[in-house]
Amino acid sequence: MGLRAGGALRRAGAGPGAPEGQGPGGAQGGSIHSGCIATVHNVPIAVLIRPLPSVLDPAKVQSLVDTILADPDSVPPIDVLWIKGAQGGDYYYSFGGCHRYAAYQQLQRETIPAKLVRSTLSDLRMYLGASTPDLQ
């Protein structure tokens, strides 16, 4: 069973419709999942559910730490699947962005910039298969 997130998420940076800048590989707008989402939220790291173990390159994590300290706006936000449980609970799943996640953890930040991708239990099942929890 996943953790249930409480409290409101805080928005970061510019509002909806603001220019996004370049995403991975120089593409405008970020990832395939969140390319059309302009709003970036400061999501509490404590509410993120990361069910898959990460394989990290320590040098890449350190490079991101250095970049976050020097120019945090140049680091793209992570994508977070936002799923409503059967009884209205909010669940925030993160599968990618493992190096960015580790960098923010190393910096002992309480939040991480993220784009919330509204998703469903069916979407989550695509990632987790039979291991998908019964979200309340």
Swiss-Prot record:
GO BP annotations listed: response to oxidative stress
Required cofactor(s): Mg(2+)
SUPFAM superfamilies referenced in this protein's UniProt entry, alphabetically: ParB/Sulfiredoxin
Gly residues: bias regions: 14-29
Alphabetical keyword list: Antioxidant, ATP-binding, Cytoplasm, Disulfide bond, Magnesium, Methylation, Nucleotide-binding, Oxidoreductase, Phosphoprotein
GO molecular function ontology, one term from the record: oxidoreductase activity, acting on a sulfur group of donors
Gene Ontology terms: cellular component: cytosol
Regions of compositional bias (Low complexity) in chain numbering: 1-13
Reactions that this protein is recorded to catalyse: S-hydroxy-S-oxy-L-cysteinyl-[peroxiredoxin] + [protein]-dithiol + ATP = S-hydroxy-L-cysteinyl-[peroxiredoxin] + [protein]-disulfide + ADP + phosphate
UniProt xrefs under PANTHER family: PTHR21348, SULFIREDOXIN-1
Role played: Contributes to oxidative stress resistance by reducing cysteine-sulfinic acid formed under exposure to oxidants in the peroxiredoxins PRDX1, PRDX2, PRDX3 and PRDX4. Does not act on PRDX5 or PRDX6. May catalyze the reduction in a multi-step process by acting both as a specific phosphotransferase and a thioltransferase.
Name recorded for this polypeptide: Sulfiredoxin-1
Organism of derivation: Mus musculus (Mouse)
Organism phylogeny: Eukaryota, Metazoa, Chordata, Craniata, Vertebrata
